[in-house]
């Protein structure tokens, strides 16, 4: 995985964890958890692509990996919509920058997961 992407994930997760969004802190914690989950999933797909011989191992280990892939794309779409919504409602520039960078990172991760999955199909 690209070291810039790793630091981007870490930076955004750290900044999101420091935000105080009042009653929506549970939503924010959920977003942070999903971000971490997507990072791990993207990393595992990338590793499987690097070891193309692992495709059969991946499929036998997780017969439902296409279903899982579909679920991850749904999570990404939800997070993208949530980031867009947060960008519209927040007036705090720190939060705007964080959500904008998170949105950009989500779009990059979505593209990477698509690329990895096409290589595995």
UniProtKB/Swiss-Prot annotation:
GO biological process: exit of virus from host cell nucleus through nuclear pore
Organism: Influenza A virus (strain A/Anas acuta/Primorje/695/1976 H2N3)
Protein known as: Nuclear export protein
Coiled coil: none
Pfam families the record matches: Flu_NS2
Parts of the chain that traverse the membrane: none
Keywords noted in UniProt: Host nucleus, Host-virus interaction, Transport, Virion
Domain of life (superkingdom): Viruses
Gene3D superfamilies per the UniProt record, alphabetical: 1.10.287.230, S15/NS1, RNA-binding
């Amino acid at each position: 995985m690209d070291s810039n992407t790793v630091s981007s994930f870490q930076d955004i997760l750290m900044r999101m964890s420091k935000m105080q969004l009042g009653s929506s802190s549970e939503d924010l914690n959920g977003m942070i958890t999903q971000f971490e989950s997507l990072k791990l999933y993207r990393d595992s797909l990338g590793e499987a692509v690097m070891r193309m011989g692992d495709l059969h191992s991946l499929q036998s280990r997780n017969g439902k990996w296409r279903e899982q892939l579909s679920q991850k794309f749904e999570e990404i779409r939800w997070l993208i919509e949530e980031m867009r919504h947060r960008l519209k409602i927040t007036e705090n520039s720190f939060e705007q920058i964080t959500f904008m960078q998170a949105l950009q990172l989500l779009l990059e991760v979505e593209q990477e997961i698509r690329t990895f999955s096409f290589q595995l199909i």
